[in-house]
Structure formats: structure tokens, C-alpha cells
Regions:
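Beta-propeller domains with acidic blade repeats across secreted/periplasmic ectodomains
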Residues: 1-200
């Protein structure tokens, strides 16, 4: 099938099936504080989402949600899906700031992005955590190296692009339970080096 990734401002189209139960109520104990800059005020769950689409385009199924603004996907040799999700620059310095991060997109996963202070912390049992936090930036392209012409040591690395700081990182991943933990390393940077996409 095909995959479509969409940011937090994109509504889920009508008729889309879901692997998740649609229980996206903002049912926090304390009321959420909206973004003081007005970003995403009134935008409610599920936030950004990923759908699997049949080759004929007729059947859409949401496989994961709770993203801020992922713009690309990568699939490893085992067929597992990953994305590089955005932060919200207005949140830097707030207790609910969530850095850009690499996510392992498992079936029916929820990553807990909500507007303002309502983001789910990683310790919530039903919120998937990140493989690795990257920090402030603007995620764009993401690709595994197994179709590149790089030397063998790069073939299984995940390459991620940051437009803001003109940086390409590599991420090494180790299995951790049913997911992964990662370590980032700067691969290339420059000024300007505004990378918007990457494919090998």
C-alpha cells in the first residue's frame, strides 16, 4: 500500500477507517492552557496522522496519530515505519515543550500531540515515546541508507534532515523491547543548507 502523512492542522477525511479506537477527548484533569501565540487554538485530537492507502486509492486506514507536523516517512529493511516529527518553536522554554524527534510508527500508535499544554507526557501508558529526541529544528526529509551508495557502515542508518539549521543527522538504533532507542550524530551541515527532502 501507500502511506500518507499529515500535520496537526489537517482534518482526517470522512470515511477513513482507523486501527485505533477514536477516543481522542481532551479529558485532562486540569484545563489545558492554549498557546499564547494562538497556534493551533481549537485544533483538537487526533493531531497529525498517518494513513495507509490501498493502491487503487479507495481504502484509507489511519495507522497512527498524535503527531505535531511530520512531513516524511521512512521504512527500514524489516518494513517498519519511522517519521521525524516537528516541535513547536513557540513552546521552547515551556514545561510542555517537545523537541523534534524520531518516532517508530507502530500499528495503532498514538504519540500524544495536543495543542498548548495538553500534550501527553511520554510516561502516559498509552502514548508512544520517541526513538530519539533531536532538539529544536524543522524536520523535513527522512530516509534509510540501504539504497544509498554510501559505505557499508551507513547502509542501516536512518538519515534525517533539519531545514532550520541546515543539518543532516544519522541515527543509529538499537532494539528496546518492541521498539528502538536511537543515538544521533551530525553527518553534514552548512550555511545555507536548507534541505527539504532526501531519497536514496
Amino acid at each position: 500500500g501507500l502511506y500518507l502523512v499529515s500535520g496537526n492542522h489537517s482534518a482526517v477525511p470522512e470515511g477513513v477507517g482507523s486501527l485505533q479506537p477514536p477516543v481522542w477527548g481532551l479529558d485532562s484533569l486540569l484545563p489545558a492552557m492554549p498557546d499564547p501565540q494562538g497556534h493551533a487554538v481549537g485544533i483538537e485530537a487526533p493531531g497529525g496522522w498517518i494513513c495507509r492507502i490501498s493502491p487503487d486509492g479507495k481504502d484509507w486506514t489511519m495507522v497512527a496519530s498524535g503527531f505535531r507536523n511530520s512531513v516524511d516517512l521512512a521504512i527500514n529493511r524489516e518494513g517498519e515505519l519511522f517519521t521525524f516529527d516537528s516541535d513547536l518553536e513557540f513552546d521552547v522554554g515551556s514545561p510542555w515543550y517537545r523537541p523534534t524527534r524520531v518516532n517508530h510508527v507502530t500499528s495503532a500508535s498514538e504519540f500524544g500531540w495536543r495543542a498548548g499544554s495538553a500534550k501527553w507526557p511520554e510516561y502516559f501508558a498509552d502514548s508512544n515515546g520517541a526513538v530519539v529526541d533531536i532538539g529544536p529544528g524543522s524536520p523535513t526529509g527522512i530516509s534509510f541508507g540501504h539504497h544509498s551508495n554510501f559505505p557499508d557502515r551507513f547502509q542501516d542508518k536512518l538519515f534525517i534532515c533539519d531545514w532550520t539549521f541546515g543539518t543532516i543527522y544519522t541515527v543509529d538504533m538499537e532494539e528496546s523491547g518492541s521498539s528502538y532507542v536511537g543515538t544521533k550524530r551530525e553527518f553534514l551541515n552548512g550555511t545555507p543548507l536548507n534541505i527539504s527532502a532526501m531519497r536514496f
